[in-house]
Amino acid sequence: MSDINDPNSISLPVGSSCTSRGASTETFTTSRSTTLFSSQQESKDEGNVELRESITLPTINHRVLLSLKESAKVIGTKGSTIQNVREINHVKIGLSEKQLGCSDRVLSCAGRIINVAHSLGQIVSVLKEGSTVSSAEKYAFHFLNPILPPPTRDEFQDLTLDEINKIGTSRLMVTNSQLSSIIGKGGARIKSLKERHRVKIVASRDFLPDSDERILEIQGLPNAITNVLLQISKILLNELDITFASERRYYPHLRSSSPSNAVSLAASTSGVQTGASNYLNNEFKATLKIPESYVGAIAGRRGNRIANLRKFTKTKIIVEKKIDKTVIDVDPDNRTFIILGDHFKNVKLAESMLLKNLDVEIEKRKSRLAKK
């Protein structure tokens, strides 16, 4: 979010003032040269304005919750649908990785607020293609189930049946602080959004698992949802708060009541075997096998490197002690590193950084051996 100003109020620093200065400067020359200078200056000004607009127009990143079936529809054949949205609207748009056993994925869309709003409105249209009002599915993950009832003819008497069938829903993911900003004092803002754009808006009671985010369900015609998202973006950017950044975001993951139900994490890197990630009592866990010969380099002198990694990722990293020679070691070539954390993304970050450090050490060793 590079700027919190309304795009309509953006000042254009290179404009009439430069042209007037140019005109007054050229008073001492012929009228022909004045005209030439002015046209060149105007052309230069236009280029500067376009450049400044591309830099200063506010940007935003919205996240939408989708089911696996909806995700497949958004991606399209060989990624054609999502690529089309990306190219038409000039946005960065993508989906979170599939997590084993999870029925949901998160769609992220970042760019200029107008482009993001149009993109998500287009996604609503894509999801409604070939479906009807009564074709809603039921999901075990209740956040995917609609909160609002389907639209009826009584509510939209001025619309045809075909138009009513185009009414769709967007599950916008917002943090608790963002939701308060959208609702406004005494619910004034959300009421204005509903009435002005003729949409229904409701927030989920529950927070998404292990996060400070809730679902803001918006129901309406795609164009209406686009306009609502544009207004919501402006509200959030104008009330940008430090608490927005510190609130926990939701990432698809399994929750389990016993260690036997595990979430598979990333595949191995550089020959390192990655174990399962168990979620139990609000704690995520990742287990890595690091080759014994690299443990010292990964841990650092007096454990400083691993200590810095713990601090940076806000995780607990436990290095398994070397087994006594009198005990039979089932895996003498590798040492186990266990990563524990309260947040899934922190554990994933620590895991990826450990693997990256290992890759660096492997390359260093290869270089040294090549020089000998």
Curated annotation (Swiss-Prot):
Gene Ontology MF annotations: RNA binding
InterPro entries assigned: KH_dom, KH_dom_type_1, KH_dom_type_1_sf
Subcellular localization: Cytoplasm; Cytoplasm, P-body; Nucleus; Chromosome, Telomere
CDD domains: KH-I
GO biological process, any: chromatin organization
Gene Ontology cellular component terms for the protein in this record: chromosome, telomeric region; nucleus; P-body
Biased composition range(s): Polar residues: 1-23
UniProt region (Disordered), positions on chain: 1-49
Predominant localisation class: cytoplasm
Keywords: Chromatin regulator, Chromosome, Cytoplasm, mRNA transport, Nucleus, Repeat, RNA-binding, Telomere, Translation regulation, Transport
KH domain residues: 59-123, 167-232, 283-354
Compositionally biased spans, kind Low complexity: 24-39
PROSITE patterns given in the database record: KH_TYPE_1
Residues that span the membrane, as ranges: none
PANTHER family: KH DOMAIN CONTAINING RNA BINDING PROTEIN
Family of this protein: Belongs to the HEK2 family.
Primary role: RNA-binding protein involved in the correct localization of transcripts in the cell. RNA localization is a widespread mechanism for achieving localized protein synthesis. Involved in structural and functional organization of telomeric chromatin and regulates silencing at the HMR locus.
Self-association state and partner proteins as the record states: Binds RNA.
Name of protein: Heterogeneous nuclear rnp K-like protein 2
Gene name linked to the record: HEK2
